[in-house]
Amino acid sequence: MLKKRIIPCLDVKDGRVVKGINFVNLTDVGDPVDAAKAYYEAGCDELVFLDITATHEERDTTVEMVRRVAEQVFIPFTVGGGIRTVEDMKRMLQAGADKVAVNSSALANPQLLADCAEKFGSQCVVLAVDAKKEADGSWHVYLAGGRKDSGRDLLDWVQEAVSLGAGEILLTSMDKDGTKSGFDLPMLEAVSQVVSVPIIASGGAGSSQHILEVFEKTAATGALAASIFHYGQVSIAETKKAMQAAGLEVRI
């Protein structure tokens, strides 16, 4: 059985962490390496860096950031945002990222998943999906940070993506994102019924109880959150103790 993973998410722009992290005495709250080290020491299992840098020219700062993080942090980390080509993915992996997440570029060009998986292996390729529930009860995949309906059915898309070579799914509920009311359990369960790759739950975490709940009630193997970790509202160590007490497989 796969161990359950707690995964903080950091937004980076121009090689700097955008949202301040207040849960530890960081000398430089905007430094991704300091933030990553602090999370590593706090006991997280993996990290996700989401690059919200706007232009292609500025990506060199991201590559440099990845290199610095890889030198000093010894847990797996994923980099996502702005990955459009096999070459983009290659640069991130060569710099030291363990996995690379693709989102809208995979929707625009599904073959990208197959090309990347063939070159680097499925274990490096993470499909990031933003989804929202529709009036008919189905879920649609959204683009542009959840602002634009792609028209694609979520369950169809994840099955296609996995068949092409995606080795993991980072699934964000746009309905739950930012609400702190708990993860979208029905959506996670629906996706886990149609694919067999690991799923990271994202969107809605507001407490350690929500993290416990997503692992007890769905097949998700990872729980991702940002602000509850950044602002020290939830202790990773305490959450893991609760998970262990509940009989879940976890790295202490």
Curated annotation (Swiss-Prot):
Associated pathway: Amino-acid biosynthesis; L-histidine biosynthesis; L-histidine from 5-phospho-alpha-D-ribose 1-diphosphate: step 5/9
Main location per the UniProt record: cytoplasm
UniProt-listed Pfam families: His_biosynth
Reaction it catalyzes: 5-[(5-phospho-1-deoxy-D-ribulos-1-ylimino)methylamino]-1-(5-phospho-beta-D-ribosyl)imidazole-4-carboxamide + L-glutamine = D-erythro-1-(imidazol-4-yl)glycerol 3-phosphate + 5-amino-1-(5-phospho-beta-D-ribosyl)imidazole-4-carboxamide + L-glutamate + H(+)
Subcellular location: Cytoplasm
One of the GO biological process terms: L-histidine biosynthetic process
Record EC number: 4.3.2.10
Entry GO MF terms: imidazoleglycerol-phosphate synthase activity; lyase activity
Gene3D superfamilies: Aldolase class I
Active site: D11, D130
Disulfide cross-links: none
Keywords (A to Z) from UniProt: Amino-acid biosynthesis, Cytoplasm, Histidine biosynthesis, Lyase
A GO CC annotation given for this chain: cytoplasm
Function: IGPS catalyzes the conversion of PRFAR and glutamine to IGP, AICAR and glutamate. The HisF subunit catalyzes the cyclization activity that produces IGP and AICAR from PRFAR using the ammonia provided by the HisH subunit.
Known partners and oligomeric status: Heterodimer of HisH and HisF.
Family statement: Belongs to the HisA/HisF family.
Protein name in the entry: Imidazole glycerol phosphate synthase subunit HisF
Organism: Streptococcus sanguinis (strain SK36)
Lineage: Bacteria, Bacillati, Bacillota, Bacilli, Lactobacillales
